[in-house]
Swiss-Prot record:
Cofactor(s) it depends on: [4Fe-4S] cluster
Function: Converts 2C-methyl-D-erythritol 2,4-cyclodiphosphate (ME-2,4cPP) into 1-hydroxy-2-methyl-2-(E)-butenyl 4-diphosphate.
Originating species: Methylobacillus flagellatus (strain ATCC 51484 / DSM 6875 / VKM B-1610 / KT)
SUPFAM superfamilies, A to Z: Dihydropteroate synthetase-like, Nitrite and sulphite reductase 4Fe-4S domain-like
Residues reported in the UniProt entry to bind [4Fe-4S] cluster: C300, C303, C346, E353
Gene3D superfamilies in UniProt: Dihydropteroate synthase-like, Sulfite Reductase Hemoprotein, domain 1
Keyword Glycosyltransferase: no
Uppermost EC category: oxidoreductase
GO BP annotations, alphabetical order: isopentenyl diphosphate biosynthetic process, methylerythritol 4-phosphate pathway; terpenoid biosynthetic process
UniProt catalytic activity: (2E)-4-hydroxy-3-methylbut-2-enyl diphosphate + oxidized [flavodoxin] + H2O + 2 H(+) = 2-C-methyl-D-erythritol 2,4-cyclic diphosphate + reduced [flavodoxin]
Protein name from the UniProt record: 4-hydroxy-3-methylbut-2-en-1-yl diphosphate synthase (flavodoxin)
Cofactor note: Binds 1 [4Fe-4S] cluster.
Keywords from the UniProt entry: 4Fe-4S, Iron, Iron-sulfur, Isoprene biosynthesis, Metal-binding, Oxidoreductase
Record lineage: Bacteria, Pseudomonadati, Pseudomonadota, Betaproteobacteria, Nitrosomonadales
Family that this chain belongs to: Belongs to the IspG family.
């Protein structure tokens, strides 16, 4: 499915560096580093890994003078590596000072994330918020007004709770919290416009950690503004719980046409790559038919007919192989991200699923003849057997990609002009 065939709420388009965000552009995948930004080498390495995995925007923490002092160098090192991913500065508490004191940082970032709940307190709050917006104006940068229910403006909370208590029909506590989030986002976006920031340089978000609350907040928010919306379930958690929670929330909203950029906020397992959040975000969009990022492998779950684990191992190897190739294939073979591959475990559904894919292999189940027919574009082409089935099948996949997606290939796609492109990689 082309992204334009999905019904989306109409929004302005905001440019984050070379990446457009809004209803006229594809839903954008972004991620965030967990390195100390003051450690430029570690941050460059992780940003590069996230970008190579397919992240189209990467957010970095800018929380100290030491971190701010390294942002310009980080940007230049990434550029030297051929990595043009836009960097977003995540500011809390002291962003007004850091942007003023480190102009190299302010210039190098493609967007500033501002949390209205901790930009300042009391009389200093408006002054410090204004300073950050003026920096965005001076450096011609967009901002994200990012409200989080864990860090709402305490003065605003107290005022709204007092007002609610005096209503004839007070809102329930959860409904009041959702309204606080929405009002904070919209009021601060309006304040940014009053200070002179154009409306097409504003993205907003309202983050919560409960699925149903996120859905309700964004449905309401989406009906009350035309700013692009950043979607994400904050503190989603670890492992399958985090994946399921984010998928449940984001899928409902995306199906409603709400959401212009997404991040899946997973807590990594010890030693786990940060890139998993990028893969999950891509797979949410791809399984919904909204965008394509990498060829996905169809594989049966296995049953009593598939006592061998070989088909599972082959499916895993092929999926990893395809994803590993995508940083190069994405630019070399446009359209390959739409390719489908089937790795099936027995004769029941194997031939049928294999015929429906661009390339499919039907491995023998328990008691079946130990051969594996391969189907290309619905036609049986060869039968594999022996110890080299995996290697031989990989060669068939490589040849199919080369023939069909190279220059002049029948499945090759021309660029979409969205700015979401991959440029040649350098070693790191």
């Amino acid at each position: 499915m082309d992204h334009q065939s999905l019904s989306r709420r109409t929004t302005k388009t905001v440019m984050i560096g070379h990446v457009p965000v809004g209803s006229s552009a594809p839903v954008v995948v972004q991620s965030m580093t967990n390195t100390d930004t003051a450690d430029a080498a570690a941050t460059v390495r992780q940003v590069y890994e996230l970008w190579r995995a397919g992240s189209e925007i990467v957010r970095i923490t800018v929380n100290s003078p030491e971190a701010a002092a390294q942002v310009g160098a980080i940007r230049r090192q990434l550029d030297d590596l051929g990595c043009n991913v836009p960097l977003v500065g995540d500011f809390h508490f002291n962003g007004h000072r850091l942007l003023a004191q480190y102009p190299d940082c302010a210039e190098a970032l493609a967007k500033y994330r501002i949390n209205p709940g901790n930009v300042g307190k009391g009389s200093k709050r408006d002054e410090q918020f204004s300073a950050m917006i003026k920096a965005a104006i001076d450096y011609n940068k967009p901002v994200r007004i990012g409200v989080n229910w864990g860090s709402l403006d305490q003065a605003k909370m107290a005022r709204m709770m007092d007002e609610n208590s005096k209503r004839a029909a007070p809102l329930a506590a959860d409904a009041l919290m959702r309204e606080m989030l929405i009002q904070s986002a919209l009021e601060n976006a309006a304040a940014a416009e009053e200070l002179g920031l154009p409306s097409d340089r504003i993205i907003i978000s309202c983050k919560v950690s409960a699925v149903q609350d996120l859905i309700k907040v964004y449905r309401d928010l989406g009906s009350r503004c035309d700013y692009p919306l950043h979607l994400g379930l904050t503190e989603a958690g670890m492992g399958s719980k985090g994946i399921v929670a984010s998928t449940a929330a984001l899928s409902v909203l995306l199906q409603d046409g709400i959401g212009d950029t997404i991040r899946v906020s997973l807590t990594p397992e010890p030693g786990e790559s940060r890139t998993k959040e990028v893969v999950v975000a891509q797979e949410i969009l791809q399984t919904m038919g909204i965008r394509s990022f990498t060829p996905l492998v169809t594989a049966c779950p296995g049953c009593g007919r598939t006592t061998s684990t070989f088909f599972q191992e082959l499916a895993q190897k092929i999926q990893h192989y395809l994803r590993d190739q995508m940083p190069v294939w994405r630019s070399q073979y446009p359209g390959v991200e739409n390719m489908s591959v089937a790795v099936m475990g027995c004769v029941v559904n194997g031939p049928g699923e294999s015929k429906l894919a661009n390339i499919g292999i039907s491995l023998p189940g328990t008691g079946e003849v130990p051969v594996a027919p391969v189907y290309v574009d619905g036609e049986k082409t060869v039968t594999l057997k022996g110890e080299r089935i995996a290697d031989d099948f990989k060669v068939i996949v490589e040849e199919y990609v080369r023939v069909n997606y190279a220059e002049g290939g029948r499945l090759r796609q021309q660029g979409t002009g969205t700015g979401l492109k991959t440029i040649p990689l350098k070693a790191i």
